[in-house]
Amino acid sequence: MLIEQITQALTAVRQQKPLVVNITNYVVMNNTANALLAIGASPIMAHSKQEMVEMMSFAGALVINIGTLDSVWTPRMSYAVEQANANGKIVVLDPVGCGASSLRTETSREIARLADKLIIRGNASEIIALAGEQAQSKGVDALDSSDAALGAANFLVAEYGASVVISGETDYIVTKGQTVQLNNGHEMMPYVTGMGCTLSALTGAFAAVGDDTGLAAAAVLGVVGEIAAEQARGPGSLQMNLLDELYQLDEETLAKRLKMQVS
């Protein structure tokens, strides 16, 4: 049943071409915009408070990524979340580097508190830090394994009413009463910058067509990353192949290659 929902969500994104508003970091804007286009969605990078009322009135979802955070960005992010709330739209929070500095940690928590409908997507160290536990981090990279963050993820589900996606060698999608484990992807993927940020952007696209868990996006990127790596000579060709495979992915291939366990 879950597999059918995932494949239907892929078709829905391509048919509906939802607009996804991204307040994201300078490093990954190009990557995430291209990934959204390749999957069939419509990206816009909107950072101004002056246009956010209009943007969130017709956008499908809001993605907040704190990767290049500063004091100018913070009030814009909060205001955007308020407008998403006013329009009943899902907010996807990517707490990049949460735990590496108090600014990142407190900003992430403030956004999580503000959002009415929330999906949190982070690596294990970010999820652990967001929940207030001691995490091992090296900049924005995780030093904790995905399963080490399951307790923290369940806390965030209860605390914020959120769905939580823990990405890593194994991906976990944690919702109230259910945990889904995905075992796709490839060991080369962490060598391409912004791979997690790309997942967060895709999560926004799938949220816009009804997936309020983050499962469909994680399933798609895991399968696509696996396929893209088969012909890749290194991170450069993997990044290029990834866009092609996002564009080419069909329901049958997704269902056939998906490695999923539910508990």
Curated annotation (Swiss-Prot):
Segments crossing the lipid bilayer: none
Co-factor(s): Mg(2+)
EC class of the enzyme, as a word: transferase
Pathway(s) of this molecule: Cofactor biosynthesis; thiamine diphosphate biosynthesis; 4-methyl-5-(2-phosphoethyl)-thiazole from 5-(2-hydroxyethyl)-4-methylthiazole: step 1/1
Domain of life of the native organism: Bacteria
Gene Ontology biological-process entries: thiamine biosynthetic process; thiamine diphosphate biosynthetic process
Protein name from the UniProt record: Hydroxyethylthiazole kinase
Species of provenance: Vibrio campbellii (strain ATCC BAA-1116)
